[in-house]
Amino acid sequence: RGLGDVYKRQSLGQVFGAIFHNDQILWPSLAYLLYSLAYVITNGVLFYMYKFVIGKPNDFWVVGVIATIIGFCISPMFPILNKYIPRKWLFIAGQTCMVLAYVLFIFGRDNVFLMDLGLVLLNINFAQLVTVLTLTDAIEYGQLKNGQRNEAVVLAVRPMIDKFTGAVSNALVGYIAIAAGMTGSATAADMTAHDISTFNMVALYIPLAL
């Protein structure tokens, strides 16, 4: 049976029960929730940043190229690094890269190199990879602690978080577009200081705090 079928059979009560009765799932899940929420919100507004804030919509293609290249490099590199570097430090490194990315997005918009560097740092997803491995390890921990092996329930945690953060991101991106006047035939020249401030607050400052 496919994992999709397994996930469908798990009720929300079972998933939340697995989270709250296994502290090794609870804290990584919370960390992943905050990471995922920040990442998907920022990723969802990058087009608006390039079109309405920076005024270079034709340069938006570089976002997908950098994300693809970094994704292909980081995933195979992670297990090699993990042989020599503890997961805790890889997680901290991933979060540090993300914070630096936000700093560059806020202060380095006029510099193409700094913007590209910010995109590189944003896509270094060590935090995500560490969380996935920690949740997998939590299956054994839960069996030792509670006497039950809830493998399917534990594996359903991450997809559930992804769906939740995706829904929140879609709502916030729509709100940002309307609240900051980034709709219709508007251009970067039409943006006021208030519009940019609204964009920065929801698209960058709040995710940075997360």
Predicted regions and their residues:
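Short, small-residue-biased leader/transition segments that mark boundaries at the very start
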Residues: 2-7
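Pair of pore-lining "gating" transmembrane helices in MFS-fold secondary transporters
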Residues: 20-45
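Short amphipathic helix-loop junctions that connect adjacent transmembrane helices
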Residues: 44-59
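Structural signature of the two symmetry-related core transmembrane helices
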Residues: 89-104
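Hydrophobic core of transmembrane alpha-helices in multi-pass small-molecule transporters
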Residues: 113-128, 134
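Helix-to-loop junctions at the C-terminal end of transmembrane segments
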Residues: 74-87
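A membrane-interface helix-boundary motif in multi-pass transporters
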Residues: 175-209
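A late C-terminal transmembrane helix in Major Facilitator Superfamily
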Residues: 148-180
